[in-house]
Amino acid sequence: MLTEFKQFIARGNVIDLAVGVIIGAAFTAIVQSLVKNLINPLIGIFVGKIDLSNLVFKAGDATFKYGSFINSVINFLIISFVVFLIVKAVNKITKKEEEEKPDTPTETDYLKEIRDLLKEKETK
């Protein structure tokens, strides 16, 4: 059982996934700090409040914390844009690698070549 677990953990996909989750969590913290400490104050200058997360709308006993929602939307947009840029870069690199690969002959190509050689030999 322990050996199987070691083999499972040692597989590339599991390790890649773990690294991705850890980096994603760290990146999320960076984006949240960016939004809280830089973007919110800039927006707050125009809105009149520095801390957007405290923006609320009250209707009777109900309190709608739309400032926190705005923060979450900004976080989402930044993270989505960065992920988009990363995927775009990876696709560009992958496409270049595919273009650089020489075409390897297929089984059909070899059979056609053999056929052509046999035809040549028969005509001589």
Swiss-Prot record:
Gene3D superfamilies referenced in this protein's UniProt entry, alphabetically: Large-conductance mechanosensitive channel, MscL, domain 1 (1.10.1200.120)
Membrane-traversing stretches: 14-34, 37-57, 67-87
Record's GO cellular component terms: plasma membrane
Recorded topology in the membrane: Multi-pass membrane protein
Main location as per UniProt: membrane
SUPFAM superfamilies reported in the protein's UniProt record: Gated mechanosensitive channel (SSF81330)
Cell location: Cell membrane
Top-level taxon in the UniProt lineage: Bacteria
Keywords: Cell membrane, Ion channel, Ion transport, Membrane, Transmembrane, Transmembrane helix, Transport
InterPro entries assigned to the protein according to its UniProt record, in alphabetical order: Mechanosensitive_channel_CS, MS_channel, MSC/AndL, MscL_channel
GO MF, one annotated term: mechanosensitive monoatomic ion channel activity
Matching PROSITE patterns: MSCL
Main function: Channel that opens in response to stretch forces in the membrane lipid bilayer. May participate in the regulation of osmotic pressure changes within the cell.
Subunit record text: Homopentamer.
HAMAP family cross-referenced by the UniProt entry: MscL
Similarity comment: family membership: Belongs to the MscL family.
Full protein name: Large-conductance mechanosensitive channel
Organism: Lactobacillus acidophilus (strain ATCC 700396 / NCK56 / N2 / NCFM)
